[in-house]
Amino acid sequence: MKILVPIDGSEFSKHSIEFVTSRATLLGHNPEIELLSVQAPVPARASKLIGNGSLSGYYDEEANVILEPAIEALKAAGVKATARYAVGEAAPTIAKVAEESGADLIIMGSHGRSALKGLLLGSVTNSVLALCDK
């Protein structure tokens, strides 16, 4: 089973990691767990000033701040995982990575907004649900 776990470093995404570590036996024998950090794109004007090499380094650093503690938490619980980052808008990027990687399951936190607030303010989780075919 391939499991995608998008995280952003928030308390809500930490709950996703806790969920995976506490329920590892329910996820099947040797599940393939991939952590994903979606980085917001730097505005075009700024990226021209920064340059591609520095921009890539910036994205690497930002993603590592989020991904490394999660990998360590999973490792401490005996759960193997890989990690990657992608640049883009959160929901469509998560859905795209899930499709490309053949993920069977996406485990992600939710901010716990009410249905009305989610409708009015939007929800990454709801958008991912709407965008995924599986």
What are these regions (language model features)?
Residues M1-G53, A77:
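Small/aliphatic-rich secondary-structure junction motif
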Residues E72-I106:
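Structural beta-alpha unit
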Residues V20, A70, I94, V128:
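Aromatic/hydrophobic pocket-lining residues that form π-stacking "cages" and hydrophobic walls in ligand
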Residues P6, R84, G109:
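Active-site-adjacent beta-strand anchor residues
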Residues K96-K134:
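Gly/Ser-rich helix-loop-strand patches that form or flank binding pockets
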Residues T21, N64, E68-K75:
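Class I S-adenosyl-L-methionine
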